[in-house]
Amino acid sequence: MYLLFHGVTHGGESLFPEVFVDPEYRRTAHWQKGQWWFHVSYNLCEGNGEPNVYTKGGVLKCSREKEGWAGNNPPSKDTRATEVKVSFSKLGVKPEAGHQLGLAFALTNATGDATQKSFFWPRSAEVQAPNTWRQAVLQ
């Protein structure tokens, strides 16, 4: 799956993409294993069954490279677009026409404090609720 985010620098502020994928379009009210969170900033971060997995047990879980997916990082001040590539094998999906996925996206300034902003698609999407994500159908 290839995603391209344009306009990731806005008013001199960098915005970092997050991708939420429900590979089987289960539309669950809460996260389950097999539902993925991908974040691209100065490192690549991922969560299988949970979002916002930056650290676990005090250990940084983000890195410059991750198995099964990639994103252009670290961004520079001149970065205008961010590419994200996720293999279907990472998602546990055989890419066949008609296969349905749940998808949502966010752009965030990733400050980690009260000034943090997030912009979602769809606008009604909620990070913690995969049933608010939109349907995508492979062709």
Regions found by a protein language model. Name each.
Residues 1-139:
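Structural preference for beta-rich elements and adjacent junctions enriched in aromatics
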